């Protein structure tokens, strides 16, 4: 077993190599995306199993902060004592595993519950292209911390992501949501947000709510956390009050975290729609081109001219537009109705006249809005993220507000990468953008973990 001090650097440097290697492969195969499916299937298994083993078999050490407390509680449960947790499913799992698993085996089970649902959720939605989403989750800013330190939170949010993936199967979704709550009660917030945005679907509303919460938090200071502490839904659980009024971490308004939180939504609005728009523009050019319009007109004229309709429509060598348009469903007579209108349109010879385009609103000009309106699940995911993140902004001044931030940040990798990976709406992967996003996201994680955090410890 490796020394505990090496695990965090190995994670950061090892995942850096994995991300760079995958990004180079995706970038090189931009025109051969189909050849990457076999790689994706193998990589999601190899990387997933490797991460479970790496996290699960780490030594019990203070380097992983709360891991020591988890180990002490588990050993107490093994001896018949009571757990210190108020989360029923987590307590039940402790008692079950305590009968036949050692402490190291218990942490392997926790690592499996933390990592496996992420892979299953991505596979449920993206199929053979699940690996980029899974890799984005493994390299997210908070992944390592909630795998080795905030263990219950990580397990609960991973199960909740799997519940989101079964949004179209309530029989599966609701038990998974209940399981997530059983691992950690804080998941009640993103669960409620996911159910609420099912009925309030406009992303513009939730984006405005996010901005409003940011303004209120910056102006009113700690009013938000006092409100949350006062209306604590778990009266018997003092964790929320400790997170807000504790003094273990530096509090204050974090503009950097605020900017970090809005990156996925901004990226969606600016980039997401380009994937769908290119396909739509190609279909529009093919479907409304002059050649196809001319062929449709010829077919219509031939159909009218066949059988008994031929004599009814043609009188003395002159075409009767009224009869022709009536046969085509036109209500009136004369060249202004039915097929005649198309024939005598400014395009002429059966070409459709150019129609005036509706002037789009300000939000419609953003390409990502189109994807949000054509993919209900992605819109629901974005709206859930905005609502949960907005509630964190209200308590951003708290000393341990990162505990609240994770209730939205765990969705961030999926929100960020979803528009570029094949799913129900997007059918062609944008491998170049996938490579760029994977590198950009992990660059932030790497700099924070390898450069910024060590400097804070020195200074």
Please place each PLM-identified region on the residue numbering:
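Short hydrophobic/aromatic helix or loop-helix immediately within or flanking a transmembrane segment
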Residues: 66-102
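Transmembrane-helix signature of polytopic, membrane-embedded enzymes
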Residues: 38, 122-140
């Amino acid at each position: 077993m490796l020394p505990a001090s090496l695990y965090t650097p190995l994670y950061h440097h090892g995942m850096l190599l994995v991300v760079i290697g995958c990004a180079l492969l995706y970038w090189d195969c931009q025109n051969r995306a189909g050849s990457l499916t076999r790689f994706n299937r193998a990589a999601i298994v190899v990387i997933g199993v490797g991460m479970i083993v790496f996290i699960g078999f780490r030594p019990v050490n203070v380097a992983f902060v709360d891991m020591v407390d988890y180990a002490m509680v588990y050993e107490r449960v093994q001896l018949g004592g009571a757990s210190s947790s108020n989360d029923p499913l987590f307590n039940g799992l402790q008692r079950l595993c305590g009968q036949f698993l050692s402490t190291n085996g218990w942490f392997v089970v926790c690592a499996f519950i933390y990592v496996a649902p992420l892979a299953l959720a991505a596979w449920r939605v993206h199929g053979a292209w699940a690996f980029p989403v899974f890799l984005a989750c493994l390299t997210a800013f908070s992944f390592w911390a909630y795998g080795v330190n905030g263990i219950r939170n990580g397990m609960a949010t991973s199960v909740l992501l799997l519940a989101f993936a079964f949004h179209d199967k309530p029989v599966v979704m609701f038990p998974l949501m209940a399981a997530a709550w059983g691992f950690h009660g804080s998941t009640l917030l993103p669960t409620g947000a996911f159910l609420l945005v099912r009925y309030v679907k406009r992303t513009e509303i939730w984006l405005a709510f996010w901005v409003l919460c940011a303004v209120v938090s910056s102006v009113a200071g700690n009013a938000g956390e006092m409100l949350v502490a006062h209306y604590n839904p778990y009266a018997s659980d003092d964790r929320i009050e400790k997170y807000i009024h504790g003094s273990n971490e530096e509090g204050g308004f974090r503009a950097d975290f605020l900017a970090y939180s809005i990156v996925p939504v901004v990226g969606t609005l600016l980039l997401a729609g380009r994937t769908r728009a290119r396909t739509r523009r190609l279909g529009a050019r093919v479907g409304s081109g002059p050649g196809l319009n001319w062929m449709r007109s010829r077919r219509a004229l031939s159909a009218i001219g066949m059988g008994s309709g031929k004599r009814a429509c043609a009188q003395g060598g002159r075409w009767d537009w009224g009869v022709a348009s009536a046969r085509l469903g036109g209500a009136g007579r004369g060249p202004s109705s039915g097929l005649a209108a198309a024939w005598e349109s400014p395009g002429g010879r059966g070409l459709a006249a150019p129609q005036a385009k509706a002037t789009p609103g300000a939000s419609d000009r953003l390409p990502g809005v189109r994807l949000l309106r054509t993919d209900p699940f992605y819109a629901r995911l974005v709206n859930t993220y905005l609502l949960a993140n907005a509630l964190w902004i209200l308590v951003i001044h708290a000393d341990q507000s990162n505990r609240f931030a994770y209730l939205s940040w765990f969705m961030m990798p999926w929100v960020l990468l979803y528009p570029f990976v094949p799913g129900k709406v997007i059918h062609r992967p944008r491998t170049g953008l996938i490579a760029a996003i994977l590198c950009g996201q992990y660059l932030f994680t790497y700099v924070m973990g390898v450069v910024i955090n060590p400097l804070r410890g020195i200074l």
